[in-house]
């Protein structure tokens, strides 16, 4: 083991200042040590702020977007209420044709006497306490299920894996990547054609659908299906299909701070975090006119790109 010999140590020359100067030197070193310690604390705080700032800024941009503060309103836009009327008419047509089922909990949200009310069947309920923020005059509040033709998942029996050349792609929440895309190729699962046919009757993803994670650590992630591709997602996710609404707007809305907070409060706390389908369908959506939805998404993506944020 390496060591310094006694003879070497005893022969060292040591500069020796007067006693009073020794005291002044020690006091100075103690003061510098204190300053270094204070600097270290300040540095750690700065590092914490720097690491938290990008996420906080991203949330702030999203919140501005869904509150109607990201782009100016255009008086020539068709009001959101007119869009809702067209959505209701389209849903009735699809119900008549047997393509979708009638909503069990269809509701209409409206304003009266400076308050917000929700009409559920013949019952009217004041929902002022549920409204999280003010929105522009030509926007409206609506439940997510009332602007979608599908919010659903597959049966909860997990199908067995098969070789890729024998099956159909079967994704899960882990395939909703942090860069805002969906993983279709790396370490993915495949299921038999028979299982696919059986499970796809409830929720078969299509282009412009949104895959929304509702179970586990990835809870609250929303990803847009940007291509026509045959695949299923496990019950860890649900398929959200907007109707006559700009899908990217709903995708970003589902990742807004307001929805994230709601999902955290609403999830089941026993075992693995699990957000029930009923809670997702009841999400309150601040709905802008269709053209403004497009402008919001365009500006949102410009800002996120400038800040080098991936969603």
Where does each model-flagged region fall?
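Feature representing long, continuous alpha-helical segments
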Residues: 23, 27, 142, 206, ...
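Hydrophobic alpha-helical bundles that form the membrane domains of multi-pass transporters
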Residues: 18-19, 29-33
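Specificity-determining recognition surfaces
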Residues: 1-12, 256-285
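Extended, domain-scale alpha-helical bundle/helix-rich regions
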Residues: 45, 50-51, 55-128
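Non-catalytic DNA-recognition/assembly elements of restriction-modification systems
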Residues: 11, 19, 23, 42-45, ...
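A short beta-sheet element
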Residues: 1-9, 172-173, 189-255, 276
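Low-complexity, Lys/Gly-biased intrinsically disordered segments
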Residues: 95-104, 127-129, 140-182, 196-200, ...
